[in-house]
From Swiss-Prot:
Residues 38-62, 248-265 have a biased composition (Acidic residues). Keywords: Coiled coil, Phosphoprotein. This is Coiled-coil domain-containing protein 82. The modification Phosphothreonine is found at residue 202. GO terms for cellular component: nucleus. The gene is Ccdc82. The modification Phosphoserine is found at residues 170, 194, 301. Residues 204-232 form a coiled coil. It comes from Rattus norvegicus (Rat).
Amino acid sequence: MVHARRHETRKNSKTQVPEQKSRVDWRRTKRSVSQLFDSDEELDSDEEIGSDEDLDGGESIDSDGKLDISKDSGINEIPEKETELNLIKVESERSNSKCHMNTSSSSADEEEMNKTKHNDLPDDEAHPGQAEGHHNKLTGQVLEEDVEDECIKPGKRKRLSSVMYDSDESDDSDILVRKASAKHPRRVVEDECSSLEMERETPEKSPAARKREYHQKLQELCERSRQKQRHNSGRNCESSEKDSCSSTDEDEDDDDYGDAENEDDYMIDDFVVGDEEADEENKNQGENLTTSQLKLVKQNSLYSFSDHYTHFERVVKALLINAFDGSFLETLYAGKRKKSYAQDMLTSLHYLDDRFIQPRLESLVSRSRWREQYKERVESYSDLSIHWKSPENCGCQACGLHRYCKFSVRLSGKLYNTRTMETDDFMSRDKQVFIVGRICAERTKIYHKLKHFKFKLYQDCCSIAYTKEVGDEQVKDTVKRLFCQLKKSGWIRKKHGQLEEYLNSADYFQDEKFKL
């Protein structure tokens, strides 16, 4: 009865073990472990009670000798009791060890414990001598694995840029750990170094900058002095040619010039002089401008800041004066005229020849294959007439190329001087005829108009001067009156428009790209 009851109790205790839960659900795992502890405690209490009864019953049977047991049955009962005692000891040790274990142990260890519980009973009954050692090994492994799990702690991420103490992470260590980034001290050191370098470089660069500023200001002063000298030299020339000049104006000019020199000296004194010799050389360069250099500057059209129409008006006025006084242009180009208005006219004449007409003529010739003889003929004769004729398959007399020539070019007129506009009566009735192609005829027309434009303009001025009544008035007054009339009537503007048209036609002329 006792054995059957004990067997039923162990069997019931097995069935009360809950099923294994998933390893992911930690709450269910903890709950199953707690239930397992309760069932093991009940089982231990029942087994202790049963073992006491078995011991009492065995003693009574042995002492009284009331029961007759065979040898075989006695042999079988002894090992059963021994195994039961061993199981009770092992389970009591297991319960004590589990009570001290952490409830947060891994589910894998609990599965191994459950498997050993299910497999322990038949193994113990078949091999009673090995049960105790086997259970001791299992409990030792479980304890070691639990201790290892308790010691393992996940690491914490620490910021590099922050400065903190690590006393909270480890209770045992009292060492203060400083963790700081190296960017901030570098940044401060670089700033200090850069500031020191800048302070060192600034005194080194300051003398060079001062020298540059000093030379720039000296150049400006030289330019101012040159302009003033030009202005004063022009005034002096005009005053020398005039019959009478007021002394008050001269005094004012002298005062102004003296004040300007004083201002220049005052500005130069404020400079930090590095080399006195260089300063003297710069001053001498500004003061040693001769009249010949000033003449070249005025004659050069690059130094003229007037517009095209202003230059053209001066040219018309110069041609009008030469129409009344034939020696004006000759003396002007010879440098005998020193007045400012005469120098302005000379500058405008150079500007018309060197800047307006000559570059276009060179461009037209450079893009053609004209013979030198044909070019000289076109430049020498002032009159041109182009006529259409029946085409001939022959060589062009202008460029020498073989093509269909259907234009006849006739050159005539007197030879003249391009500067003084004086004509030459030698072979005045001579004529030249050339048979050319279409492209050469167009090029000849444009080239001749530009080359002889100033001479044609002079002829028009002469015709106007001859038709107008002069009377007893002076040449200067007559030229002024005629110039005002031509300007009001729009004649000067019209001639300027013709010049612009010729210049544009020369710029946009297409050479031998046209098909015949």
